């Protein structure tokens, strides 16, 4: 009889202890998820800011008073062509002579 009571008490303690541990684990998991989610949001904001900065720096200037560096004709404004210079291996926007007389792009 004592053995049966001890076994029942042990079983109840194991079940109660398991539920307590499960609740603690759920709370820790929830806190961990919230912490990681907030960290992920901060990282995404930083990534967006860095990408925006890179995009701003990589844009080609158009229609400046000085020569603008270009990669293709579409990087230059109306009346300019993207001309490659062999001496510095770079292309820049230069005014078309035809535009001076006709005004067409």
UniProtKB/Swiss-Prot annotation:
PROSITE patterns: DELTA_ACTX (PS60018). Residues 19-60 form a propeptide. Its main location: secreted. Keywords: Cleavage on pair of basic residues, Disulfide bond, Ion channel impairing toxin, Knottin, Neurotoxin, Secreted, Signal, Toxin, Voltage-gated sodium channel impairing toxin. Expressed by the venom gland. InterPro entries: Delta-hexatoxin. One of its GO terms (cellular component) is extracellular region. The presence of a 'disulfide through disulfide knot' structurally defines this protein as a knottin. Selectively slows channel inactivation of mammalian Nav1.1/SCN1A, Nav1.3/SCN3A, and Nav1.6/SCN8A and shows higher affinity for insect Nav1/para channels (site 3). Induces tonic repetitive firing of nerve impulses in insect neurons accompanied by plateau potentials. This is Delta-hexatoxin-Mg1a. It comes from Macrothele gigas (Japanese funnel web spider).
């Amino acid at each position: 009889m004592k053995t049966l009571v001890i076994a029942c008490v042990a079983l109840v303690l194991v079940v109660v202890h398991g539920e307590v541990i499960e609740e603690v684990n759920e709370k820790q998991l929830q806190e961990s998820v919230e912490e990681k989610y907030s960290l992920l949001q901060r990282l995404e904001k930083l990534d967006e800011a860095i990408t925006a900065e890179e995009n701003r720096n990589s844009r080609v200037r158009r229609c400046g008073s000085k020569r603008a560096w270009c990669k293709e004709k579409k990087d230059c404004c109306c009346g300019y062509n993207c001309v490659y210079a062999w001496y510095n291996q770079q292309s820049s926007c230069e005014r078309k002579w035809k535009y001076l007389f006709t005004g067409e792009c």
